[in-house]
């Protein structure tokens, strides 16, 4: 009788142990620059200074359709904008494992909602994944290789073009690299349609996707960004 009870109890205990081992919290220490607001080793936080950054994450619309409830009562200091961080399957890069909206700081650090600490993903089962960074008017980028999901991950998109899949970063000078600006219609490609979006929003002040240098106003400088990146497209999915 005792022997028959021991076997199922052992199975239950062993299964619970394995489950706890498989699920883990992983902290991502990521650095990434956006071309639009970049200047001399850092990015401008003009949108924050003008109180234009929304308190809730802006990626709940097409093409992202992210339904996360990230929001704050006040934008932390030195924040450039919201970004969307995705973890994708290491054998099927189009399959999203997990997503989180986060803040991007002027020094390129991706932070949690406090604007200080690194972003943490909870209850991950996968052993490795690709890291994807999405922004509302820059071309998405993906890590050049899958990363091991240890308790803490370090990945720097700013130090080399080879750190992005298909070398899809722009040279910012100063031996630094960033995400390509100009995708004002958020379709993953910079083309004539992006000119039309800027034209239809010309001189608007606010949190606009057509504001490609992210200074708070849509103007001729945004045309120049599109012109410099014309025909470029994302390598993500």
Regions found by a protein language model. Name each.
Residues 97-109:
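Solvent-exposed serine/threonine-rich low-complexity stretches and specific carbohydrate-binding patches
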Residues 24-37, 73, 148-186:
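Extracellular beta-sheet/turn segments enriched in Thr/Pro/Gly and aliphatic residues
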Residues 25-76:
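Short amphipathic, basic-aromatic surface patches that mediate peripheral association
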Residues 168-173, 184-209, 215-236:
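Alpha-helical segments with a strong preference for the paired helices of cellulosomal dockerin domains
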Residues 82-85, 126-136:
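A short, solvent-exposed beta-strand micro-motif common in secreted/extracellular proteins
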Residues 77, 111-128, 137:
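Short Pro-Gly-centered beta-turn/loop motif in secreted/extracellular proteins
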Residues 1-28, 237:
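Bacterial Sec-dependent N-terminal signal peptides
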Residues 135-144:
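Short acidic/polar inter-strand loop motif in beta-rich domains
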């Amino acid at each position: 009788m005792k022997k028959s009870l021991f076997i199922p109890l052992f199975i239950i205990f062993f299964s619970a142990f394995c489950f706890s081992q498989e699920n883990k919290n992983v902290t991502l220490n990521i650095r990434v620059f956006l071309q639009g607001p970049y200047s001399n080793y850092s990015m401008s936080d003009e949108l924050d200074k003008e109180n234009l950054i929304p308190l809730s994450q802006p990626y709940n619309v097409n093409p992202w359709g992210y339904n996360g409830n990230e929001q704050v009562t006040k934008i932390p200091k030195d924040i450039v904008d919201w970004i969307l961080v995705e973890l994708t399957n290491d054998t099927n890069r189009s399959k999203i494992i997990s997503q989180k909206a986060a803040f991007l700081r002027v020094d390129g650090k991706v932070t949690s909602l406090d604007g200080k600490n690194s972003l943490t993903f909870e209850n991950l089962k996968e052993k490795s994944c690709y890291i994807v960074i999405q922004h509302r008017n820059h071309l998405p980028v993906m890590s050049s290789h899958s990363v091991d999901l240890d308790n803490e991950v370090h990945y720097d998109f700013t130090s080399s073009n080879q750190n992005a899949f298909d070398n899809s970063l722009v040279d910012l000078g100063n031996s630094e690299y960033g995400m390509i600006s100009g995708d004002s219609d958020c379709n993953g490609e910079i083309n004539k349609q992006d000119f039309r979006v800027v034209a239809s929003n010309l001189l608007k002040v606010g949190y606009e996707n057509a504001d490609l240098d992210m200074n708070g106003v849509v103007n001729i400088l945004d045309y120049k960004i599109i012109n410099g990146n014309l025909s470029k497209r994302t390598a993500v999915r």
